[in-house]
From Swiss-Prot:
The keyword Glycosyltransferase does not apply. Coiled coil: none annotated. One of its GO terms (cellular component) is HslUV protease complex. A double ring-shaped homohexamer of HslV is capped on each side by a ring-shaped HslU homohexamer. The assembly of the HslU/HslV complex is dependent on binding of ATP. The gene is hslU. This is ATP-dependent protease ATPase subunit HslU. It is found in: Cytoplasm. It comes from Desulfatibacillum aliphaticivorans. Its main location: cytoplasm. InterPro entries: AAA+_ATPase, ATP-dep_Clp_protease_ClpX, ATPase_AAA_core, Clp_ATPase_C, HslU, P-loop_NTPase. NCBIfam families: hslU, PRK05201.1.
Length: 457
């Protein structure tokens, strides 16, 4: 999906995110540039670095959602990290590299799941044979044979008997029809209970995780644990085991490392919290500047050692975000500013935006509540004037207290629908219409009392 044109990317983002057209255009261009880079001759390809982006705007306006939807749309490795995670006391530089290690871990799992999906059919067939072997064990015969020291018995497992074959096929049909789903069978499950050992080096107590299972691989003895499980669950367990045996983990890791290096996106949230405003070099500001210095090589391009191998960060796209209430982007160190050449200011949400957020996206808030109540047989209907009233109250509370953007709508909706959600299983009226009067009656008293609105809405 990375070959989508910028206009198509924006159209896809519009299905889930209201407004913020400027930000959508920039992230769409950044994604398209990835595709363009791959079309460039090899000698120049390595020289073209991604243009990292800083999204500036208050909370709840769509900064994280834009990045997350972009990654999902393009099906690329994505990781969200908080910049404040790297400001703890005793912070050392290697901790910044943990986000690359986490991204690799996420990508390996992503690629492995896709590979397992591709071998799902043969894995299911193999699992089915193993289930049938449990339900109808192969016939065992013992035959005597003579060796140098005398006569010994030889056990032969046969599966060629025609009666047994026909019984096996009958069992297979019953298995397919689900007649054995609730029957319990004894299943031996392989487990490797190997300890994870953390080694702390003398260079700033940097944490390096070594797993004996990874180091020794097949040398570690397999512990098998016998469990009594339903046939339906046994089928899932055995299918997973067979799939793991069919995929080549070396190929998975190689593909995952390549995807991280070429397509990875890291969303660095709350970068404004590590910006140094006003008096520099005092107290925690020293730590914040240190964090920026440690982030710099990762963002500009370095090689990070992970348990799967070395990863170059030169072409990973970094999208940073922050509200910048107390600080400005210019409070970041000049070197780090230079690594984020694109700055996009997101707009605060208007009352009209709130109305659209409630009804238009594919995952619209009102649609979510309607679908939830539909499971109880309750039809929930919102009139147009109720939508306008909810948007108006959310905007007013945001203006009077803390501006938390679209997240305020969830709070308002929960307060509005509290009684309906509670009484839904017993309510006799299966069609409930929410009008503006009901919204005002339910929320007006809370909205007017500033103390209550601060704590409830």
């Amino acid at each position: 999906m990375e070959d989508l044109k910028p206009r198509e990317i924006v159209q896809e983002l519009d299905k889930y995110i209201i407004g913020q057209d400027h930000a959508k255009r920039f992230v769409a261009i950044a994604l398209r540039n990835r595709w363009r880079r791959r079309q460039v001759p090899q000698d120049l390809r390595d020289e073209i670095a991604p243009k990292n982006i800083i999204l500036i705007g208050p909370t709840g306006v769509g900064k994280t959602e834009i990045s997350r939807r972009l990654a999902k749309l393009a099906d690329v490795p994505f990781l969200k990290v908080e910049a404040t995670k790297f400001t703890e006391v005793g912070y050392v530089g290697r901790d910044v590299e943990s986000m690359i290690r986490d991204l690799v871990e996420v990508t390996v799992n992503m690629v492995r799941e896709k590979e397992e999906d591709e071998v799902a059919l043969p894995a299911m067939k193999a699992a089915e044979e193993r289930i049938l072997d449990i339900l109808l064990p192969p016939r065992r015969e013992t035959q005597p044979f003579a060796d140098a020291e005398g006569e010994t018995t030889l056990e032969i497992v046969t599966r060629g008997d025609s009666n047994q074959d026909s019984t096996r096929e009958k069992l297979r049909k019953m298995l397919h029809s689900g007649k054995f789903d609730d029957r319990y069978v004894d299943l031996e499950i392989n487990e490797r209970n190997t300890p994870v050992v953390e080694i702390f080096s003398n260079m700033g107590m940097e944490e390096v995780g070594f797993n004996f299972k990874d180091m020794l691989g097949g040398l570690m003895p397999k512990n098998t644990k016998k469990r009594k499980v339903k046939v339906s669950e046994a089928m899932e367990i055995l299918t997973q085991q067979e799939a793991q045996g069919l995929i080549d983990m070396e190929k998975v890791v190689k593909k995952a490392l390549s995807r991280v290096e070429e397509s990875g996106i890291i969303f660095l949230d709350e970068i404004d919290k590590i910006a140094v405003g006003g008096g520099k070099g005092q107290g925690p500001d020293v730590s914040r500047e240190g964090v920026q210095r440690d982030l710099l090589p990762i963002v500009e391009g370095t090689t990070v050692n992970t348990k799967y191998g070395m990863v170059k960060t030169d072409h990973i796209l970094f999208i940073a975000s922050g509200a910048f209430h107390m600080t400005k982007p210019s409070d970041l160190t000049p070197e780090l500013q230079g690594r984020f050449p694109i700055r996009v200011e997101l707009d605060s949400l208007t009352e009209h935006d709130f109305m659209r957020i409630l009804t238009e996206p594919k995952n619209a808030i009102m649609l979510q509540y309607q679908e939830l109540l539909k499971t109880e047989g309750v039809e929930l209907v919102f009139t147009q004037d109720s939508v306008a009233e909810i948007a108006s109250i959310a905007k007013e509370v945001n203006d009077r207290t803390e501006n938390i953007g679209a997240r305020r709508l969830h709070t308002v909706m929960e307060c509005l629908l509290e009684d309906i959600l509670y009484d839904a299983p017993e309510v006799p009226e299966k069609k409930i219409t929410i009008g503006a009067e009901m919204v005002r009656a339910k929320l007006e008293s809370i909205k007017e009392d500033e103390d209550l609105s601060r704590y409830i809405l």
